[in-house]
Structures are given as C-alpha cells and as structure tokens.
C-alpha cells in the first residue's frame, strides 16, 4: 500500500465506494477491516488482532476507526436477534449454554445508542491496548453515508 494506514469501518455496503472516495484513497492504498458498527468490543478478539497485525506485520503507523450516521447497529435489539435465532433453528439449549459459559449473549449482541460514543469507546480501547505501540495515532471519524462528509470525533495526533 502507498499509505501506512489501517481503517476499521462499518460493514455497511453504502461505504464500499463512498469511504475511499471521501478519504481520497485508491485501491490498495490502505488496509481495511470491517465489522458491524466499526465496533471493537473485545481487547483480544478478531478485530483487535487484525488491527495489531496491520501495525506489526503490515507496518501501518496510523489507525482510523470510522463509523457512520444512520448505522443499523444503533437499532439492533438483542431480544429480536435471539428470537430470530430461535426461528432459524438455534435451540434455547444452545443459547443457554453460551450464556452459561460466561458470555452475556444479550450484551454481546446489543447495538449502540449513539455513534459518537461508540466510536470514542472503540478508539479508547485500541489506544489503551497493552499491545498497541505508543505513538500510533488512533483517529475516530464518522461519515455521512449520503454525502461522504467526514466528521472527526477524535484526532489521534492530539491524544498520543
């Protein structure tokens, strides 16, 4: 890649072409990791591992966490998700086993109320991660999925 950047963005399909255009990126410029809501919700989960791989193995020296307005994760209701799982053949026994194993399934499935708060929470988790090197700017942005306007909610250069 021409730029040593890794981006975590939401998996919303509206961002596939819009985000690179808004950031003036060409194909191959950056590493992109996607998750529902651009959420990093576990310090040792797959999303965090991908960001660390980008930094250590792929030499990224800047991280952007980019959510978007009108995100579907703001409306995710864990009870509706659990009902849908039951309707699609996941048994109550399996759900009980997952809950019993120490995972609060409702909390794990829960969306967020406010995109700004969610992005800032993810930025802080990544910034304070014990394996993230100091001096790596962790930026938080929100994109308007209709216009491509980017709003900076955390300038990582000011919080090194």
Locations of regions flagged by a protein language model:
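Divalent-metal-activated hydrolytic enzyme cores
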Residues: 1-3, 38-45, 53-61, 73-160
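Short, conserved "active-site rim" segments that organize catalytic pockets and cofactor/ligand binding
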Residues: 1-48
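Short beta-strand segments
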Residues: 8-10, 34, 66-68, 141-144
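Short, surface-exposed, charge-dense and proline/glycine-enriched linear segments
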Residues: 19-31, 63-67, 92-102
């Amino acid at each position: 890649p021409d730029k040593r950047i890794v981006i975590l963005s939401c998996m919303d399909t509206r961002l596939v072409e819009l985000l690179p255009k808004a950031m003036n990126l060409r194909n191959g410029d950056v590493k992109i990791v996607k998750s529902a809501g651009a959420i990093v919700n576990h310090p040792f989960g797959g999303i965090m591992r991908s960001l660390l791989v980008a930094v250590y193995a792929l030499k990224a020296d800047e991280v952007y966490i980019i959510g978007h307005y009108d995100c579907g994760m703001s409306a995710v209701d864990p009870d509706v998700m659990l009902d849908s799982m039951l309707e699609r053949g996941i048994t109550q026994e399996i759900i009980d086993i997952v809950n019993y194993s120490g995972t609060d399934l409702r909390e794990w499935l829960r969306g967020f109320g406010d995109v700004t708060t969610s992005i800032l929470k993810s930025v802080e988790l990544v910034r304070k991660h014990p394996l993230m090197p100091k001096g790596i700017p962790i930026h938080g942005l929100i994109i308007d999925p209709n216009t491509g306007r980017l709003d900076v909610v955390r300038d990582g250069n000011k919080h090194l």
